[in-house]
Amino acid sequence: MIINSLKRFGITTGAAASAAAKAAVMGLLNREKRNTVVIPTPIGLRLEIPVEKVEIDSGIACAEVKKFSGDNPDILDGLVIRCCAKLNESNEIVIVGEKGVGKVTRSGLKATMGETAISPTVRDMVINAIREVTDKGIQITIEVPNGDIIAENTLNKMVGIVGGISILGTTGIETPVSDDDYLEHIKCELNVIRQSYDFVVIAPGNSAAKYASKLFDSNSIIKVGDRIGDSIKLASSVFRKVILAGLPAKLLKVYAGIFNTHYSQGDARLESLTHASVLAGLPYDVLTKITNALSVEEAFTYMTKEQRRKVMKIVAEKILSRIKSFNGDINFCVIIFDYDGESLSRVGC
């Protein structure tokens, strides 16, 4: 499919980088200047993405792809992702982030401290796209013109990524947020699930849905993005049991009473984590590290597994009490996963 035919959806920076990398390799090896390329995604969907420019020189080729954000109010919409390809002597694909791609300066993120902010999933996407063209060794350089300037208006600095944007994406597709049509889509999907199940599993994102699928039939799971509160309200009018399953960062917002977890609606993740950690009786030195962390992932590195379980049990219990106010006649359950997919807490299940 052509990505532009997905009227309200967009592509992630990772998908844009994968398309640019594939176009650059095709230019390098075949001297092709493609207007579009087709890339594989982690969810099995293949995307045909427009290519803005291909430049071919001796021993190197570069391609540019514009990020398309669909109906999302995204500051990265229209951003150019530029990839350059050249052969290397190995049989491996080496991916390097250059100007405009941020560097990781704190622990706790998916990328290792000191590396460029290109997620492991995106690295796999780029490799898979290139392997459709060649099995030769390739070096890919990813650049984002003005990425350092644009990054000043993102949340990157708050989580320890400096000097540019992050190249991210777990599916390659960017779903719309905060629009009534999206809620209608959720309502329709809930009705479909109800035909086969008397319960539903609400997962805010792709990782949560993936981890939840280890516990429940994947057809009983719905991904709702940031609209957690609205989705729970809709589900509670249709199902006898509603299960909220997610990762700590998203659910810590719900702990604070923020049911639309889009960044524009507020952020209390670390404050919530600190509050729950105090209630859990964590030592003062650990609390100090948590309050000074730049992300929940970093804060988790300062806690033992048992401490994480104790804190997340408090978080899950508070969330359960909040969502019960939506409909007291419904059986609600809250599951919080660790970042490796292990269940940290299950309350009401």
UniProtKB/Swiss-Prot annotation:
GO MF annotation, one: cobalt-precorrin-5B C1-methyltransferase activity
Catalyzed chemical reaction(s): Co-precorrin-5B + S-adenosyl-L-methionine = Co-precorrin-6A + S-adenosyl-L-homocysteine
Keyword S-adenosyl-L-methionine appears in the UniProt entry: yes
Keyword Endoplasmic reticulum in record: no
Coiled coil (residue ranges): none
EC id: 2.1.1.195
Pathway: Cofactor biosynthesis; adenosylcobalamin biosynthesis; cob(II)yrinate a,c-diamide from sirohydrochlorin (anaerobic route): step 6/10
Keywords: Cobalamin biosynthesis, Methyltransferase, S-adenosyl-L-methionine, Transferase
Cysteine pairs bridged by disulfides in the record: none
Top-level class of the enzyme under EC nomenclature: transferase
GO BP annotation list: anaerobic cobalamin biosynthetic process; methylation
PANTHER family given in the database record: COBALT-PRECORRIN-5B C(1)-METHYLTRANSFERASE
NCBIfam families (alphabetical): cbiD
Record family assignment: Belongs to the CbiD family.
Protein known as: Cobalt-precorrin-5B C(1)-methyltransferase
Provenance organism: Saccharolobus islandicus (strain Y.N.15.51 / Yellowstone #2)
Classification lineage: Archaea, Thermoproteota, Thermoprotei, Sulfolobales, Sulfolobaceae
Gene name tied to this protein: cbiD
